[in-house]
């Protein structure tokens, strides 16, 4: 109830702001006469500081002033408090974060939707990343880089196939020997469910009609699949004989050549009846532009700079700019950290596109809560799915 009241107050504040009259106050200027913009950084390791420094050295019109802008018990702020401050124009013009603190519905009230900005760079971005982002229900945080959750296996273990159905995966796993499983045995039911949500949750929500289908047979099958993993409170298995190994592909690991040294590997998507994406998108750093910013044009200019070659060169993750990804790949091949075949495997992972869960935190918590009750034996998968459907349907209806 407290959260609902906060959101109602937030909407009222924004409506009041929309109806305000008069001229906007003059923007603060730096000592050199440039328009001053503020950027709050929520993580000490954020690359945003480097972006701001480089931008300031290039821009003749704007200057970014970076400040720590944290929330938590020590700071006396909650995420809701920060959202309210941003709506009132008391927060920074830009907000850089490395977490997923703002994957909620209220983001559309306080942050600028960045779909048009991405469209400007459509021909320059990694196609799979661009398409995954455009498939989301609004783009409010500009990713500075990305990673990919996927599964890896040995081509020799799957007959050289590029995709598997669940039945095929079970057959290949059985061929490994007694006690072998399809997925990592160390994954608990809850941990495995997180991967299920990451790869498929978005496909059970229709954002055009604000409806969902978590009571479908397909989702029920996924819940039952999770029950095949070890219980959350069970000890770690002594051995982990499995067909598919859950893998977060990061730029440092990939360009460092660690995975490639083994040689016999391939990327595999979540088993499905239809071939499709082999991985799902993860975004580390994101930069948001506040709706209440007094100089949205200047803030957008900075975001365009973040997508420039010189800024993308600073990104530790996989860069979202295709030319920078190509440059790093060429360098890795030339220095023999990977082969041309390795480069082709990365292309094969990205080219079919990437999944994007696009599930607001509130829905994620609903699904996780009901799933954990099922995994603990408090209800059947069908009962859990029915409760998920009811609660998420209500949530979506209230916001349609």
Question: Across the structure, where does each feature detected by a protein language model lie?
Answer:
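Short, well-ordered beta-strand elements
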Residues: 31-44, 62-69, 94, 140
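Short, polar/charged alpha-helical segment
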Residues: 43-63, 67, 103, 367
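Extracytoplasmic "Venus flytrap"/periplasmic binding protein-like
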Residues: 61-125, 242, 259-260
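Hinge/lid segment of periplasmic solute-binding proteins
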Residues: 97-150, 264-270
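Helix-loop-helix "hinge/cap" segment bordering the ligand-binding cleft or interdomain interface
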Residues: 115, 133-235, 297, 380-383, ...
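A bilobed periplasmic-binding-protein/Venus flytrap-type ligand-binding module shared by bacterial periplasmic
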Residues: 151-156, 282-297, 314-317, 324-325
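Extracytoplasmic/periplasmic substrate-binding proteins
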Residues: 224-298
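Long, aromatic- and glycine/proline-rich binding clefts that accommodate carbohydrate-like moieties
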Residues: 316-369, 373
């Amino acid at each position: 109830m407290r959260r609902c009241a906060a959101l109602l107050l937030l909407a009222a504040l924004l409506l009041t702001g929309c109806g305000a009259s008069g001229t906007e106050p003059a923007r603060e200027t730096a000592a050199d006469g440039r328009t001053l913009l503020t950027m709050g950084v929520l993580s000490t390791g954020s690359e945003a500081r480097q972006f701001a420094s480089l931008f300031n050295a290039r821009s003749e019109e704007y200057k970014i002033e970076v400040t720590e802008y944290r929330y938590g018990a020590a700071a006396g702020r909650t995420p809701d408090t920060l959202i309210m401050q941003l709506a009132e124009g008391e927060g920074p013009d830009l907000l850089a974060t490395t977490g997923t603190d703002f994957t909620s519905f209220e983001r559309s009230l306080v942050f600028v939707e960045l779909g048009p900005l991405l469209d400007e760079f459509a021909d320059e971005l990694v196609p799979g990343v661009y398409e995954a982002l455009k498939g989301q229900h609004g783009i409010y945080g500009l990713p500075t880089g990305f990673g990919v959750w996927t599964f890896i296996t040995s081509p020799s273990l799957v007959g050289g196939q590029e995709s598997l159905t669940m039945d095929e995966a079970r057959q290949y796993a059985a061929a490994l020997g007694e006690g072998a499983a399809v997925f990592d045995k160390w994954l608990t039911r809850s941990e495995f469910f997180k991967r299920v949500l990451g790869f498929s949750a978005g496909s059970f929500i229709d954002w055009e009609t604000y409806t969902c289908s978590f009571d479908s047979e397909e989702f029920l099958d996924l819940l039952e699949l999770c029950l095949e993993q070890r219980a959350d409170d069970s000890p770690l298995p002594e051995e982990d004989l499995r067909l598919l190994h859950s893998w977060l592909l990061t730029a440092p690991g990939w360009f460092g050549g660690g995975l490639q040294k083994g040689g016999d590997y391939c990327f595999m998507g979540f088993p499905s009846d239809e071939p499709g994406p082999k991985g799902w998108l993860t975004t580390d750093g994101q930069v948001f532009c506040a709706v209440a910013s007094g100089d949205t044009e200047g803030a957008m200019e900075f975001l365009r700079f973040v997508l420039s070659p010189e800024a993308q060169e600073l990104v530790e993750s996989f860069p979202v700019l295709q030319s920078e990804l190509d440059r790093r790949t060429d360098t890795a091949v030339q220095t023999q950290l990977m082969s041309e075949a390795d480069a082709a495997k990365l292309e094969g992972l990205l080219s079919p596109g990437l999944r994007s869960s696009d599930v607001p935190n509130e829905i994620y918590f609903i699904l996780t809560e009901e799933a954990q009750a099922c995994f603990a034996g408090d209800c059947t998968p069908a009962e859990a799915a029915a409760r998920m459907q009811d609660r998420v349907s209500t949530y979506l209806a209230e916001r349609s």
